A protein has these predicted regions:
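ATP/NTP-dependent adenylation/nucleotidyl-transfer catalytic domains that generate, transfer
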Residues: 23, 161-163, 219-220, 232, ...
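Enzyme catalytic cores with a strong preference for nitrogen-chemistry domains
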Residues: 1-347, 365-374, 401, 406
Length: 641
């Protein structure tokens, strides 16, 4: 439960139709095993105490009483179990029979939620036996306990306030306006659905989409426990298709007819953070009754996969589609700006590195979109003290293969003249030595753009902006920054995608060699003709920083939780010890706060993903904010703990 993680499970126990005692025993057996694994929320199917396929037997008082007896037995057996359990049963209230979910915790019946929408079409005839539930909450006596009864019920954990449970049953989700929508607006971060969804061709895919989409719309965790083996097969079969989703992603799922259960951890803190960011998500709890309960606080062992590359889709097909979309977005943004400014050229400083390579590829696409020749892109290479033969050669080959205009400006003499003006010793390889070169390059590009009636296209990426790895008013400045919304880990895949689609073998080969070149600003003199200044040796691995960036900006998590997630995500990577993860996380926070002043005057550039740092859009932060609180939280952690 630490850091907002809740271990939850959806079950489909094998049962016997109308054998309540046996069914309750099956529930308890699975529940006891789940508690040993740390499960704090266990959801069982609709009518799991009786079986869904009892038909008119539901109208028999013997079956109704048998279900109550089974519930009472479960309450007694779960007094010492530290978990919230949901089971389905028929319940007679004031002479009407309801299809209900009972919510149990430590021997207490927290509440009973009746089903709202009763299907009465096709193979379903629930209105024959049952009455729809009402939103009005009333108090009823069940198993000797005074219990709230109604659809407008929420259940909140005192020890983890971000865990607020709402309940609906099967058809409720399939309706036009599911009760879970109102539950979420009233504050529910987790929805449990007790279901008895029979299996037909194509239904599993539709069911999966329903659950995923509802969790996305409601910014919640969603558990769907469906009836399985043991239900009557007189006219239907039930596959036990259990699903657990969070904010649009399926985290755990059982294969139909597998006879298994779905189990994972839900991140309730993340749901709270998403809702805090989304001001369209309006809170409305009118008419709701919230029942509070207690669970013993325990650290949840994470078994869910934490993606070490949250910006990059793991599936090759999805990744390719994502790359094509991003390239089109970048190109369209630049095309609009070129069109609006009546720019004759797009001027780009080319280094032979990844970022300038991507910017050049985007500029060529933009010209193609505008039905203009690639020659309207002016690529400029500006070798100086740190330029190597490899990067210089790659820059020239790339420009030739793309058909852009190419110009070389040797800036060493200009830089030396500038150093003489300001009294900088050329042998002192300090920050002035590095930044002076970067600013001269920007000066050349800006004036060249003026001379050719063009715009300077910025090449810096999102990761560099987060770390402030740019020279203020040097490569930090441009007239339009096409890469400003693209993290470094994704830049690689965009260039690789273009390499795979390259029109010529030479273009393919040069793009692959650029991908294989170490990331470097090449501002310090080369050693034996090789790059001497490796960016990731200085600021840390970009895959770590992109991971940290995602969880800081997208989720608003604190350092302790991000450190924990990183240890899970990069487990098994020998180079990423706890000490290394900690070191670069601390470095990230220090740089992120210290370098905001560069982002406060960022050139225009297109947003391409959910995380961006534009001061006019998604990230508004004062340039002089203090990192004290975040660094203090980190100080309380020790690598290895």
């Amino acid at each position: 439960m630490k850091d907002g993680f809740l271990k939850a499970a959806a079950f489909s126990p094998a049962l016997r139709v109308a054998d309540c005692t046996y069914n309750a025993q099956q529930v308890l057996e699975q529940l006891q095993a789940a508690v040993q694994r740390g499960v704090k929320l266990a959801v069982f199917p609709e009518f799991c105490l009786t079986g869904y396929t009892c038909g008119d037997l539901f109208l028999q008082r013997t079956l109704q009483q048998g279900a109550l007896d089974a519930l009472e037995w479960l309450l007694a057996q779960t007094r010492t179990l530290d978990t919230v359990t949901l089971v389905g049963l028929p319940l007679l209230v004031h002479g009407k029979l309801y299809n209900c979910a009972a919510v149990l915790c430590r021997g207490q019946l927290l509440g009973i939620v009746p089903k709202t929408y009763l299907p009465n079409y096709g193979e379903f005839y629930e209105k024959r036996q049952f009455t729809p539930g009402s939103t009005e909450v009333q108090t009823v006596t069940v198993c000797g306990q005074q219990v709230p009864f109604g659809t407008s019920l929420l259940f909140r954990c005192r020890q983890m306030p971000s865990f607020v449970l709402g309940v609906e049953l099967c058809e409720d989700l399939w309706s036009a306006l599911p009760p879970s929508t109102f539950h979420a607006l009233a504050g529910a971060t987790v929805i449990a659905n007790l279901s008895a969804s029979d299996e037909t061709v194509g239904k599993a895919e539709y069911r999966r989409a329903l659950v995923a989409n509802q969790s996305a719309r409601l910014l919640c965790g969603y558990l769907y426990a469906s009836a399985g083996h043991g239900e009557s097969t007189t006219d239907m079969v039930f596959a036990g298709h259990d699903l657990i989703a969070e904010d649009g992603s399926i985290l755990a799922e059982t294969a139909p007819f597998a006879g298994d259960h779905a189990e994972t951890e839900l991140d309730c803190q993340r749901m709270e953070a998403e809702r805090a960011r989304n001001t369209s998500f309006e809170h409305s709890a009118e008419g709701y009754v919230t029942v509070e309960f207690d669970l013993a606080p325990e650290e949840t062992v994470l078994t869910r996969r934490i993606d070490p590359a949250p910006f990059v889709p793991g599936d090759p097909q999805r990744r390719a589609a994502r790359c094509e979309l991003i390239l089109k977005m970048q190109a369209d943004g630049l095309a609009k700006r070129l069109e609006h400014a009546h720019a004759k050229t797009a001027v780009i400083g080319i280094s032979g590195g990844l970022d300038s390579c991507l910017a050049l590829l985007v500029a060529v696409r933009a010209m193609k979109q505008l039905h203009r020749p690639a020659a309207d892109v002016l690529a400029v290479t500006m070798p100086c003290f740190g330029t190597t033969k490899r990067t210089r050669s790659n820059a020239e080959i790339l420009c030739g293969e793309l058909g852009v205009s190419f110009q070389e400006i040797r800036i060493a003499n200009t830089v030396r003249s500038h150093f003489a003006d300001i009294g900088q010793d050329e042998t002192v390889l300090d920050v002035t030595f590095e930044n002076g070169q970067a600013r001269v390059r920007t000066l050349e590009l800006m004036d060249l753009a003026n001379r050719t009636g063009g715009l300077v296209v910025g090449t810096g990426d999102l990761s560099e902006l987060a770390l402030g790895w740019a020279t203020y008013n040097g490569d930090h400045m441009s007239m339009y920054g096409v890469n400003a919304g693209v993290p470094k880990t994704l830049v690689r895949y965009l260039v690789q995608y273009e390499a795979e689609a390259a029109a010529t073998p030479a273009l393919h080969d040069v793009l692959l060699d650029i991908l294989a070149t170490p990331v470097s600003p090449e501002l310090l003199p080369a050693k034996d003709g090789e790059i001497a200044q490796i960016t990731e040796d200085l600021v840390g691995p970009y895959e770590l920083h992109d991971f940290y960036l995602y969880y800081v900006l997208r989720c608003g998590f604190g350092p302790a939780k991000i450190y924990r997630l990183a240890k899970t995500a990069f487990a098994g990577r020998a180079e990423y010890t706890d000490a290394v993860l900690y070191k670069w996380l601390r470095n990230f926070y220090w740089r992120f706060f210290a370098q905001q002043f560069k982002r406060s005057c960022l050139p225009d550039g297109p947003k391409v993903g959910s995380v961006t740092l534009s001061p006019r859009g998604d990230w508004r932060m004062p340039s002089d904010a203090c990192a004290t609180l975040w660094l203090a939280e980190l100080e309380q952690l020790k690598p290895g703990e």
